[in-house]
Amino acid sequence: MKKALFIILIVTGILSACGDKTKVSSRETDTIALRPCPEFCEDTAFCYIEKQCSFGPRVTGSEAWRQCGDWICGEFERHGCLVEEQRGEVKMWDGTPLNARNITARYNPEEKRRVLLCAHWDSRPWADNDEDERNHHTPVPAANDGASGVAVMLEIARLLHEADSALSYGIDFVCFDAEDMGTPDWAEDGGGAETWCLGSQLWSQKMAGREDKPAYGILFDMVGGYGATFSMEEASVRYAKPLVDRLWKIAGQIGYGHYFPMRDGGGVVDDHLYVNRAGIPCIDIIPYHEYGRSVFGHTWHTLEDTPENIDRKVLKAVGQSVVQLLYNEKRK
């Protein structure tokens, strides 16, 4: 995905070069008491990625998208969730109307207190960051940038369904559509940031003003790439710093601190922005690569975004850290 990094990245780079005072947070000495929790299975999550990719690129409105969406709904239902869909018309960067499909799977649907876990499930229609310009109009396989976030959520839903004890609150797993339909690099003109995250914009418009909003949210975006580490994204810290601090600290305590370094990352246009604007504090687990063709990794918006380039260890680090956070909440 994503879109354009905010000017904060440029400012951070200037400050680092001029003063060698890059802002880095430190883990506090006091520890969080960790409660028992299930094991997140990275192999199962990887299989979920392979399955999504087996349908082909899930470009909004395509047959592969339809089939994969039906499969996602079926998997969440198999794991005991109540599945709901939101369909609505959105407009692409060039004004073309598009029928989007957001999928919500509710764990413990009867519980009033809820937590949001979310990811986008669509594929970018154009591999416009591929080194070969001949591929710039070809859809992206989207193993990492799309399937990985959904896979982590499906695995969490599975282990919650099979767990010996239930959580005392509900979880809304939301799969946002049309996140990656933003203006292609080869377009001569088009909109800006608002051309991205069309599904979450649609969803957030519905959520704004409601009293039954989730207490907080976590967005999974590109959570399976080789070499990925997850810095503290700027808008996440701005809207939900206590949640960022808690998750990063838990990750460090359970052995995944090298995947979740206590350092500031840049800002990014992503689904969590619209969730936050709807009044739900939401953070973004998104990679930050200091070196290479893209800060989002070398497969971003290329035809190399395939299951072969997924690192199960990264899936494990992200999934287990979030599961531990969820189980540290009060349980039945």
Regions from the PLM with identified roles:
Residues 44-51, 67, 71-78, 148-155, ...:
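Extracytoplasmic/secreted proteins, especially bacterial periplasmic and envelope-associated proteins
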Residues 59-60, 89-91, 110-111, 121-125, ...:
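Solvent-exposed loop/turn segments at secondary-structure junctions
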Residues 97, 216, 223-332:
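Active-site-adjacent substrate-binding region
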Residues 137-242, 267:
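Acidic/histidine-rich catalytic neighborhood of metal-dependent amide-processing enzymes
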